Amino acid sequence: MEYDLTLFEKGLEELGIVLSDEQKKQFITYYEYLVEKNKVMNLTAITEYDEVILKHFLDSLSIVKVGCFDQKKLAGKSVIDIGTGAGFPGIPLKIAFPEMKITLLDSLNKRVNFLNEVIDMLSLKEVTAVHGRAEDYAKQKEYREKYDFCVSRAVANLSTLSEYCIPFVKEGGSFISYKSGKIDEELSQAGNAVKILGGKVQDVVKFPLMDTDMDRSFVVIRKLKPTAKKYPRKAGLPSKEPLA
């Protein structure tokens, strides 16, 4: 089937991202498989082609608007995507910037199986999908404070997400949270949690998502010092009792 790439290419141009024909084909293959598998398992509520292009693919890639996520300096950088779900933003980032090393973490095994199928189908290298909870993986030596970037589009308040994500980031690295446009109250509530976990809010980047009624905010948290060993707390606590 032929797909109109006009919208996708317009969005890529706005973001300053140049993809080869092969990379564009990988995105289309990913789209087709996502929609096919979504018929038998709950991966996404968004399945219409243009909507997936805008609200999944281009939204995932819009992280390049964040200053520290400079696409010219991503070679060899390590990224972990927490609560990746159907692979957003991790898979689009891996397709667009194949020189990055990416770990995709999700708590649902069938989603991880789907991600492994996508990785094989697209012949992606240096990307690993793992099944488990952030609270558990962040305690493991091979994951804790090992990543240049932690990213997440997961729906949770910023205090909770910070406890999930900041422990994975090495000193000098960044946790970048994909948030909706209205972030000010959540940001003020999370300030102390971010500090406790060894981070500092470095930047907030706000913009409208192209051709949609969506506003996107990126909260950029810089890791200044190691996270105390007691964090994250045991599974379930960060969401039930967010750090104040």
Model regions: which residues?
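Residue-level signal for inorganic ion chemistry
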Residues: 34, 93, 179, 221
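Conserved beta-strand signature within the Rossmann-like core of class I S-adenosyl-L-methionine
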Residues: 172-182
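Class I SAM-dependent transferase core
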Residues: 1-76, 80, 110-113, 117-127
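SAM/dcSAM-binding transferase cores
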Residues: 188-244
